[in-house]
Amino acid sequence: KIKKKVFDFKNALSEKKVTNELKKNNIDLICLAGFMKILSKNFIKNFKGKILNIHPSLLPKYKGLNTHEKAIKKKDKYSGCTVHFVNSKLDSGEIINQKKVRISKLDTPDTLAKKILIQEHKLYPAAILKILSL
C-alpha cells in the first residue's frame, strides 16, 4: 500500500517539516510533477537519488519554463518529455526515460503541451516502476 500525504511547501519552515516527515516515514521515492519550485540544495542532499521530476522537453534541450514555445520557435521536428533524477542544477539530473512527440506545423504551444501531457501520463508511471524495481 502506498501512503500519501499532501504538503504545503511555501517556505524554509515548511521544507523542514516536509523533510522531517519524509525521513520519519523512511520514504523510497519523491515524485514531482508540476511542482514549479526549485528545491533547496539541503533538501536535495537529504534525499539524493530519491527525487524524480518530469519535464516537458527532451532534456537537455529547453530546461526551465516555456519549453513548448522554444521548441516551436526553433522549428524542432520533435519535442517530448523526460523523467529525470533531481540534482542541484535545474533540470540537469540523470535521465531515466524520455518520450518523443512529433511537432506538427500547425501546433501551437497549447496543442503541443496537450500532446506531451498525454505522453507524460504514460511515461512517468513506467519510470517510477522502473526505479522502484531496481
What is each of the regions a protein language model found here?
Residues K1-L134:
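One-carbon transfer enzymes
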